């Protein structure tokens, strides 16, 4: 009995120590990806805690931050503070870190030190979906994070996140700054492949369903918003029409090149079945030269048989104007049963 008691106390003490590496996941990973966008996944030979695999790896890259997580006998409570301080230094507000989400392979590896919320993957975590951000600290990539997002995001929020992951821009939701243009990091096919490879993992089925409405290559947050208004389910305020393309290229035929300077145009959101194009024109389109180019664009696209509808920032800012614009899009696409907002009076009554 004394031996059993000693072993039990030893297990308690061991749980107070921190196993490495620490893997950030779920909402903490989402917060991390908002403020820092590493692109190279860490490739490991085996599962997270295969000590032989770790021992055979090359030394960590010199550029990786040394946080002190590898200190001998590091207590879990100390590790919580180290990780939180590091995330705050990157720009994550401390109030967002009342707990830090972490991931382990199996349930027997789970520990519950104060400050950490431990999640179980239920199998060896795919090493190609882990990114090393500091010595002893990893984060799941955005493909895995997208699937996990269903545990705290609503379905419309997860839909938006899918567009952002597959976009050609980055918007930091923790900052008031503008978005930045950047190369596309993932494709919808990448995310679908991850879901298919991990269908038994929690959240994969819902994520796969959301991805049916996600499209590649949005160039701005407002282009994403325009697409979502069309593809989102009717119960979520959209038109429920997912068969669209983003940035559909239209080459100007030789016989129409005398009408415009540009050799081709791209339509923000295009519904090929009806030939309907939806454009978002932001404040930059108010420039005189830009307005002239827009006029040429609409002339050529109309001559080619496209049905074009333009949305503006003012319409997005005023609910009734946006409702009328969505009615026009529904009519052009041919969604006869989708005229959701029939009059200002009805909408005012609905809002009350």
Which residues does each predicted region cover?
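Surface segments flanking catalytic/ligand-binding clefts of nucleic-acid enzymes
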Residues: 181, 185-343
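A generic fold-level signal
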Residues: 4, 141, 262-264
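Short gly/ser-rich loop at a beta-strand->alpha-helix junction or flexible surface loop bordering the NTP-binding
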Residues: 1, 11-202
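Single conserved hydrophobic/aromatic residue that forms the stacking wall/gate
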Residues: 1-16, 341-352
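Short, function-defining helix-loop hinge/capping sites that tune catalysis or transport
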Residues: 115-118, 287, 320, 352
């Amino acid at each position: 009995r004394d031996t059993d008691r000693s072993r039990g106390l030893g297990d308690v003490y061991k749980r107070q120590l921190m196993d490495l590496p620490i893997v950030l996941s779920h909402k903490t990973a989402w917060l991390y990806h908002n403020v820092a966008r590493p692109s190279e996944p860490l490739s490991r030979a085996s599962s997270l805690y295969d000590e032989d695999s770790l021992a055979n790896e090359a030394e960590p890259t010199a550029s990786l931050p040394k946080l002190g997580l590898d200190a001998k006998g590091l207590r879990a409570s100390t590790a919580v503070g180290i990780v939180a301080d590091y995330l705050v230094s990157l720009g994550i507000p401390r109030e967002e870190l009342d707990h830090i989400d972490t991931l382990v392979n199996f349930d027997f590896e789970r520990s519950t030190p104060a400050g950490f919320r431990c999640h179980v993957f239920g199998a060896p975590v795919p090493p190609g979906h882990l990114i090393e951000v500091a010595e002893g600290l990893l984060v799941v990539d955005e493909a895995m994070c997208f699937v996990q997002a269903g545990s705290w995001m609503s379905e419309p929020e997860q839909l938006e996140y899918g567009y952002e992951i597959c976009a050609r821009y980055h918007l930091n939701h923790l900052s008031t700054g503008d978005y930045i243009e950047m190369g596309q990091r993932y494709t919808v096919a990448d995310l679908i492949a991850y879901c298919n490879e991990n269908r038994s993992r929690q959240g994969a089925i819902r994520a796969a369903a959301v991805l049916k409405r996600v499209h590649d290559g949005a160039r701005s947050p407002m282009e994403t918003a325009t697409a979502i208004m069309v593809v989102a389910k009717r119960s979520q305020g959209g038109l429920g029409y997912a068969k669209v393309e983003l940035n559909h290229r239209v080459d100007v035929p030789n016989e129409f090149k005398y009408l415009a300077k540009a050799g081709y145009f791209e339509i923000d959101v295009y519904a090929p079945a009806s030939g309907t194009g939806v454009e978002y024109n932001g404040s930059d389109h108010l420039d005189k030269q830009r307005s002239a180019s827009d006029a040429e664009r609409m002339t050529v696209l109309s001559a080619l048989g496209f049905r074009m509808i333009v949305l503006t920032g003012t319409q997005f800012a005023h609910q009734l104007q946006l409702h009328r614009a969505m009615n026009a899009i529904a009519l052009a696409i041919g969604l006869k049963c989708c005229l959701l907002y029939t009059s200002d009076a009805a909408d005012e009554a609905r809002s009350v």
